[in-house]
Amino acid sequence: TTLPIASASLAGNILINSANDIAGANTTLGITTNELVILATANSTVSAVIGTAVAGPVTLSGTGNVTFSATNLYTGLTAINYATLTAGASNVLSSGAVTVNGGTYNLNGNSDTIGALTLRAGTVTTGAGTITLGGNLTTIANGNHASIVTGNLGLGANRVFDIGDGLMDNDAIISAVISGAFTVTKSTGAGVLMFAGDNSYTGLTTISAGTLRLGATGGGTNTPLGTIGNGTLVSGAGSALDLNGYTLGTNEALTLSGALAAGALQNFSGNSVNYTGLITLGAASTIISNYGDLNITNT
């Protein structure tokens, strides 16, 4: 069923409780309260353009899947609360910030450039497409649920990843390939962030709070810590790099200035690992392997 839009402005919320579409030829969808709320309990498609009249947030709630298929014009926040938002085309979210709270943003092979990204037990998956950040990435701890990013993640500029500390072994897992000629700083949040992709970003990796944990060995010139020669800095109290049983496929220079009691360089895994990159001690630091061996061959 298609619900045609007869005018460019609506008042109130939209409830989708069956397989309905919201469409409008040459029509822009707006809300007079400057906010659009879609309550989805079924699968649906919004092919009308959501215009600049929506200055406030566009919020998707419910258990259904909503597909945006137009290049939308609004630049405010997009909040996905437990629902699934699927991109039916590229650039459906314009440049606004995105919050995923227990839901999913599925780019479905398309690409999009957004603002800042906040995940609270949320999932972003791109398929063959790429989501490019226009701001920093923040995850908020939510009990026993990790935040997940899969596919391809473009940095767009130097970025800070702020990871909240929850009950999971890994508070956030990014298996997406991270790309861009920029730096990555894990800052502020005390949570555990896992990088599990063969990342191609070319800037310095800095860990200034919490733990960055490896989830892959890397291949060729790419590693979970970016391309060869970037360097990684563990800096400040409470920061650590956990090899997690993975021996990097290439050498990565490492500078340790961290003072985390469990070790600035760790191996919290039963597997023995080798670290073959040059390690420089910028301050007193601890290197520890709680389970398997940690062999250092270049210091």
Q: What is the predicted role of each segment?
A:
Residues 64, 80-85, 189-192, 207-212:
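Glycine- and acidic-residue-biased ligand/ion/polar-headgroup-sensing regions
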Residues 1-65, 69-70, 95, 99-192, ...:
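Extracellular, surface-exposed repeat architectures
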